[in-house]
């Protein structure tokens, strides 16, 4: 879910590198129709979803005759992630749009590679309660969460008192405070270290990304 975003593209790179380990069953994108079409033709999933209905016809026409089923809307994603042939769901959608389908994946006892931190910000208590009564397992794959997870493997949590979350330094880190009153959106989108989507780049510049994490 979120195949055309940064983490989605990286996930597909891994799937392409290890075809003996991974079969792509479903691709979900919001509005990036051209890239979704390209991904679908390359990986040949059973289903693709373009959440934005205005792009449905373009995707459907491009994939006509391929045997790939094309859907639109958000509700269908919850149905598709729960299908029996799916064993792992990568949730890399931006914002809260991944919440309903993550809940559906938990109910269906899927393994979940979670990059969508907003899901836990909004509904962490609900998600954690559901995990207790499900065979579903949640793996953090967003950068800091994944690093914390790997650092804690084999550790006794009783011996861990603090985790320190660092920041790589956005475009305003060394800027004089008085300059901040006149910065523009374009300034905020010029991250010095990473090429990311617009929303996460803005969130990084404002430090909101760290607050969510």
What are these regions (language model features)?
Residues 1-48:
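N-terminal Rossmann-like dinucleotide-binding module
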Residues 4, 40, 89, 109, ...:
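Residue-level signal for inorganic ion chemistry
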Residues 6-11, 34-35, 96-103, 114-115, ...:
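Short glycine/serine/threonine-rich phosphate/pyrophosphate-binding segments
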Residues 10-19, 38-39, 120-135, 151-154:
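Active-site-proximal loop->helix
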Residues 49-51, 69-76:
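Short acidic-hydrophobic, aromatic-tinged amphipathic segments that line or gate anion-handling sites
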Residues 59-62, 95-108, 115-137:
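Rossmann-fold NAD(P)-binding glycine/threonine-rich loop
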Residues 72-104:
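Beta-loop-alpha module in the N-terminal Rossmann-like domain of NAD(P)-dependent dehydrogenases
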Residues 147-210:
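Conserved anion/nucleotide-ligand pocket segment
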């Amino acid at each position: 879910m979120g195949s055309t975003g940064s983490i989605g593209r990286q996930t597909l790179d891994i799937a392409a590198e290890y075809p003996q380990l991974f079969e792509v069953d479903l691709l979900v994108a919001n509005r990036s129709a051209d890239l979704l079409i390209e991904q679908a033709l390359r990986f040949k999933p059973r289903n693709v979803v373009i959440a934005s209905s205005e792009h449905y016809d373009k995707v459907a026409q491009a994939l006509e005759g391929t045997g790939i089923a094309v859907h639109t809307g958000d509700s269908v994603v919850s149905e598709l992630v729960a299908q029996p042939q799916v064993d792992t769901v990568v949730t890399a959608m931006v914002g809260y749009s991944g919440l309903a389908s993550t809940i559906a994946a938990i109910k269906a006892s899927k393994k979940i590679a979670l990059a969508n931190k907003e899901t836990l910000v909004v509904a962490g208590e609900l998600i954690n309660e559901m995990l207790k009564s499900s065979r579903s397992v949640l793996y953090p794959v967003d950068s800091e969460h994944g690093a914390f997870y790997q650092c804690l493997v084999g550790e006794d949590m009783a011996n861990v008192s603090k985790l320190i979350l660092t920041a790589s330094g956005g475009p305003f880190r060394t800027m004089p405070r008085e300059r901040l009153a006149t910065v523009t959106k374009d300034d905020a989108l010029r991250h010095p270290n990473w090429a990311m989507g617009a929303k996460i780049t803005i969130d990084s510049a404002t430090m909101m990304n760290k607050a969510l994490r």
